Curated annotation (Swiss-Prot):
Keywords, comma-separated and alphabetical: Developmental protein, Disulfide bond, Extracellular matrix, Glycoprotein, Lipoprotein, Secreted, Wnt signaling pathway
The keyword Disulfide bond is annotated on this UniProt entry: yes
Cross-referenced SMART domains: WNT1
GO-annotated biological processes: canonical Wnt signaling pathway; cell fate commitment; neuron differentiation
Cellular component terms per the entry's GO annotation: extracellular space
Gene responsible for this protein: WNT-6
Coiled-coil spans in chain: none
UniProt modification remark: Palmitoleoylation is required for efficient binding to frizzled receptors. Depalmitoleoylation leads to Wnt signaling pathway inhibition.
InterPro entries reported in the protein's UniProt record: Wnt, Wnt_C
Covalent S-S links between cysteines: 83-98
Residues bearing glycans: 84
UniProt record similarity statement: Belongs to the Wnt family.
Protein name: Protein Wnt-6
């Protein structure tokens, strides 16, 4: 008589939040690089920076400044936009106003609610 053994292996994706956290960590530690003289390698821009390894996130061009209006790209900038003074996310004044400060305004809106009694 013989015996049979079956073994199945698979890789499982981590939770979506974990993937996002890892990407953010790599984004925050990304290296700016320029092409090496051999045309195949990259060289980090800056002094005393270790060369990136294959798991590091690298970039070669700086992101545009979305805070300021740019006619060339059509970016409107953030000056004059409404923001939420209590929010800590993308719509919050601290981030959206790009450190320029902001003015708080309280508005009272009266609207006909079409209520029937």
């Amino acid at each position: 008589s013989g015996s049979c053994t079956l073994r199945t292996c698979w890789k499982k994706m981590p939770h979506f939040r974990e993937v996002g956290d890892r990407l953010l960590e790599r984004f925050n530690g990304a290296f700016k690089v320029m092409a090496g003289n051999d045309g195949k390698s990259v060289v980090p821009v800056g002094h005393n920076i270790k060369p990136p390894d294959k798991r590091d996130l690298i970039y070669s061009a700086d992101s545009p400044d979305f805070c300021m209006a740019n006619r060339k790209t059509g970016a409107p900038g953030t000056k004059g936009r409404l923001c939420n003074s209590t929010a800590m996310d993308m719509g919050g004044c601290d981030l959206l106003c790009c450190g320029r400060g902001h003015r708080e305004e309280t508005m009272v809106l009266e609207e006909n609610c079409l209520c029937r009694f």
